[in-house]
Amino acid sequence: MRLRNIPRANDVIAASPLVIQDPKAQRGLWQNVFGNDHPIHIEVGMGKGRFITDLAKKHPEINYIGIERYTSVLLRAVEKLQGKEQPEDGAEQQENTRQDIPENLYFICMDATELPEVFAPGEVDRIYLNFSDPWPKDRHAKRRLPSRQFLARYDQILDKNGTIEFKTDNRGLFDFALEEIEPAGWRLLMHTFDLHADMELMKDNIMTEYEEKFASKGNPICKLIIDRERR
């Protein structure tokens, strides 16, 4: 998918206090960034940021970091949270105050391949992967976020009891993820091929923009949770 280039994206992101500008310099020091020792949960491929923003508002006892590689996508999350999103109907903009923005939330603009350079071993307690790019061509399999190549990267930064939660409406990508778990040395804790049909699982479910869109069309949403096999 070709993303539209937005000229102001780089400048807005560079000036935003929500975006960590030199994340590699914070490796092993993220507790200092947040000013506390709360658990750290990250979302890789956060898109427009609704999921992780809602989580941060709901759970002030947890620190959240949203990761997005595309500036044009991250721009939407930043401007929405700061109350500066460009209105589509000519309505007057209202800028949010700092009190409206969760203090336990930051964003990073980076490629997920760099995760071990940004987080020290054991520094992250949970990773969320939501509606990731399926990279449908076989030669691109290693680019898929639930691939064994990426599982090896997550292994380097997760706490020993850390978990990964993955949601998608793409059954092919979900089946691929299920096949990668055991060979990569991970353990499947739960999975469902129709999340929204399970009322118990839906109690604490926070939907992404894509999830809401796909579910409204009747597309089944798949979800799994994994951790590493005890070593």
Predicted regions and their residues:
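A short acidic, Gly/Pro-enriched loop at the edge of an enzyme's catalytic core
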Residues: 117-126, 131
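Conserved glycine-rich SAM-binding loop
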Residues: 47
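A short glycine-rich, Lys/Arg-flanked "PGG" loop and its adjoining helix->strand segment in the class I
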Residues: 146-160
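Conserved beta-strand signature within the Rossmann-like core of class I S-adenosyl-L-methionine
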Residues: 161-168
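S-adenosyl-L-methionine
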Residues: 1-42, 50-57, 79-121
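Conserved SAM/SAH-binding beta-strand->alpha-helix loop
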Residues: 70
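Class I S-adenosyl-L-methionine
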Residues: 177-179, 184-231
